[in-house]
Design a protein with these regions (language model features):
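Charged, amphipathic alpha-helical coiled-coil/dimerization segments
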Residues: 87, 99, 108-110
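Acetyl-CoA-dependent GNAT
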Residues: 1-76, 81-83, 94-96, 100, ...
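C-terminal "cap" of GNAT-fold acetyltransferases
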Residues: 5-9, 14, 107-110, 114-127, ...
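Short glycine-rich hinge loops at helix-strand junctions in the catalytic core
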Residues: 88, 105, 128
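Active-site acidic-Proline motif in GNAT/NAT acetyltransferases
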Residues: 81-83, 87, 115
Length: 154
């Protein structure tokens, strides 16, 4: 598995994100899907990671972004194609984004997910995330699960 920072503005990534959007809309109403669009993913304070099978030019099977701010790095748009799951892809994406957060001086990584995604919550917990309260501009809603990982002293 090859995992590196790449532009999200490529057809395979756009297709993968469309799959993620379609999946999330089967779980949650549109007003509770807090997704970043393509222009937002291309902002300078956002790092976008891509996982490829078979090397640097292989098929894209996963992606994830981190929005860097002085307070924390927020994980967004983590998705692994069903055919690529169970191979450490999500773990690899999170590890690369954690390095970026540390390099940017972030003390924490945070994320918002939903209760209908127990597999995702399990991945985050295995990576050291713990549940926390709402952060940023998110409303405190029962259809949101907020998690954080402290990066200092880890």
């Amino acid at each position: 598995m090859h995992i590196a920072f790449e532009t999200p503005n490529q057809p395979e990534v756009i297709s993968l994100i469309a799959d993620l959007d379609a999946y999330q809309l089967t779980l949650y109403p549109p007003e509770l899907v807090y997704a970043l669009d393509l222009p937002s993913l291309m902002e300078p304070h956002v790092k976008f990671a891509v996982a490829r099978e078979g090397g640097a030019s292989g098929k894209i099977v996963g992606c994830c972004a981190i929005v860097l701010s002085p307070e924390y790095g927020e994980i967004k748009r983590l998705y692994v194609d069903p055919a690529g799951r169970g191979k450490g892809t999500g773990r690899g994406l999170l590890s690369l984004l954690e390095k970026a957060a540390l390099e940017a001086g972030c003390a924490q990584m945070v994320l918002e997910t939903g209760p209908s995604q127990p597999e995702a919550m399990g991945l985050y917990e295995r990576h050291g995330f713990q549940r926390c309260g709402a952060f940023g501009d998110y409303p405190d809603d029962p259809m949101s699960v907020f998690m954080r990982k402290d990066l200092v002293n880890t």
